[in-house]
Amino acid sequence: MSNKKDVAVKISGGKKIREAREKVKSDTLYNLTNAVERLKSASYVKFDPTLEIVMKLGIDSRHSDQMVRGVVNLPAGTGKTVRVAVICKEEREEEAKSAGADLVGSTNIIDEIKAGKINFDVCIATPDMMVAIGSVARILGPKGLMPNPKLGTVTLDIKNAIKNAKSGQVEYRAEKAGIIHAGLGKLSFSDQDLLKNLNAFIEAVIKAKPAGLKGSYLKAMYLSSTMGASVQIDLTSIA
């Protein structure tokens, strides 16, 4: 049975949610600057939430020629600590460690993956390890962790790949119904830094438009914060 203190906390929490919702109008379209301002003023959680973007694209992701996927280096970073694993031959392990990799190895890491031990956010591999890594493709693939040359995670340039992963590289991929979702920094970032990240991400997705696509490419865009409000972006305000 709840005591008076518990009831007071619930009432206070409910009031904060109502007040937050009142600051964002569901029937209004916002430009990026106003959207960031509104989301900050409407946030009521006690942790530092992530600014999230959802983009609806006019593609059919079931067709291979309409796949939209890539990576973006966010100018202001993500605000998250990224654990990087590097799978390489023994002669390059010291190089990977010196570059800041959190986990370095070869078949030992692959064995850990098979055992369900995945203690990393990004997996980088040298080309000569890809045959061996193929044995865990079904495990890494669904988690978005499979090294891919198109994403810069299968490379001979280990140092630069680690640097990119640690400094705020974000992968994007259109899922079913042409939806792209990504986190683009913490709400505690300055408005300027969040806008830099937003513009860099949006520009990259727009440039990734399939060459043969007919009709409208960018259908809708929404910004939100973790456990917070969501606002729709006025697409005419996107340069």
UniProtKB/Swiss-Prot annotation:
Transmembrane segments: none
Keyword presence, Endoplasmic reticulum: no
Taxonomy, superkingdom: Bacteria
Family: Belongs to the universal ribosomal protein uL1 family.
Subunit and interaction comment: Part of the 50S ribosomal subunit.
Family annotation (PANTHER family): 54S RIBOSOMAL PROTEIN L1, MITOCHONDRIAL, LARGE RIBOSOMAL SUBUNIT PROTEIN UL1M
Annotated protein name in UniProt: Large ribosomal subunit protein uL1
